[in-house]
């Protein structure tokens, strides 16, 4: 494992964390709320983002325009089945979703989840660091000074990515608190 590959793995953890937290409902309409919902169409299951365009029509409303108008009812059923606390409204060949304002209890629960997810991401970053350091110590071709230097660099990377995760979590928490 090289320093560059460790950094790439850490960046992957950060990207995964960003994708996970994008789906948290903040009370604002965002395509990420429903794009991964699975829909039963054409005899198979597909993601909503693969069979329709999802746009924000205003701050609290999503507009879903299926590529095939015949899938409107399946989209509506899929959204209801996903248990997202969202009520789809079928209007001809489109589906509208009004995003409800989150309750205080819901916000507290999402903030708990956010903190847990951010801690899991930081643990994953630290595990990458530990794996890298273990491999360094087993590498007989490196001098003690080289090992110390690389350990310092991997620690700097770990600190950088953990800080980015904390900042993202704080932004999301602030977003939840201001709605």
Curated annotation (Swiss-Prot):
Annotated GO biological processes are:
translational termination
Q: Where is the signal peptide?
A: none
Gene3D superfamilies membership: 3.30.1360.40, Ribosome-recycling factor
Primary localisation category = cytoplasm
GO CC aspect terms: cytoplasm
**Protein biosynthesis among the record's keywords?**
yes
- Give the keywords, sorted: Cytoplasm, Protein biosynthesis
List the SUPFAM superfamilies hit by this protein, alphabetically.
Ribosome recycling factor, RRF
Q: Name one GO molecular function term.
A: ribosomal large subunit binding
Q: Which family does it belong to?
A: Belongs to the RRF family.
> Which purpose does this protein serve, as stated in its record?
Responsible for the release of ribosomes from messenger RNA at the termination of protein biosynthesis. May increase the efficiency of translation by recycling ribosomes from one round of translation to another.
| Protein name according to UniProt | Ribosome-recycling factor
The organism encoding this protein is Chlamydia trachomatis serovar A (strain ATCC VR-571B / DSM 19440 / HAR-13)
């Amino acid at each position: 494992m090289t320093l560059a590959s460790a950094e790439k793995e850490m960046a992957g953890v950060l990207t995964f964390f960003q994708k996970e937290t994008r789906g948290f409902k903040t009370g604002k309409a965002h395509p990420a709320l429903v794009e991964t919902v699975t829909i039963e169409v054409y005899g198979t299951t597909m993601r909503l983002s693969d069979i329709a365009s999802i746009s924000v029509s205003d701050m609290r409303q999503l507009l879903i325009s299926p590529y095939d108008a015949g899938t409107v009812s399946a989209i509506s059923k899929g959204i209801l089945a996903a248990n997202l606390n969202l009520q789809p409204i079928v209007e001809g060949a489109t589906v509208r979703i009004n995003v409800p304002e989150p309750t205080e209890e819901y916000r507290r629960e999402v903030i708990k989840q956010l903190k847990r997810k951010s801690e899991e991401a930081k643990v994953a970053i630290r595990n990458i660091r530990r794996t890298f350091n273990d491999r360094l110590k087993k590498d007989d071709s490196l001098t003690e000074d080289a090992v110390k230097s690389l350990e310092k660099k991997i620690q700097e990377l770990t600190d950088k990515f953990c800080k980015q995760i904390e900042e993202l979590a704080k932004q999301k928490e602030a977003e939840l608190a201001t709605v």
